[in-house]
Regions:
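A cross-kingdom feature that marks ATP-driven nucleic-acid transaction machinery
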Residues: 1-71
Length: 71
């Protein structure tokens, strides 16, 4: 979890798998429910290669995206 001084929150989960399912977002959905409007986004980082949306403000991202800059 990352929190700004203003109280806004981004949730991050890391999975040691190449595939992601909706169940992998359960903790992030719970966090979003608890903090309400302060929740900005949730991300599941995984070992696969695709970036996929999983609903409003939720996204699965390849872990490698952290090291690959776009030009």
């Amino acid at each position: 979890m990352l929190e700004r001084a203003s109280g806004e929150i981004v949730g991050i989960e890391i999975k040691a798998a190449e595939t992601v399912t909706g169940r992998d977002f359960a903790g992030l959905w719970h966090l979003a429910e608890r903090v309400g409007d302060r929740f900005l986004a949730g991300f599941v980082l995984h070992l696969g290669t695709q970036s996929l949306p999983f609903g409003p403000r939720m996204r699965a991202l390849p872990l490698s995206a952290l090291w690959h800059a776009r030009s």
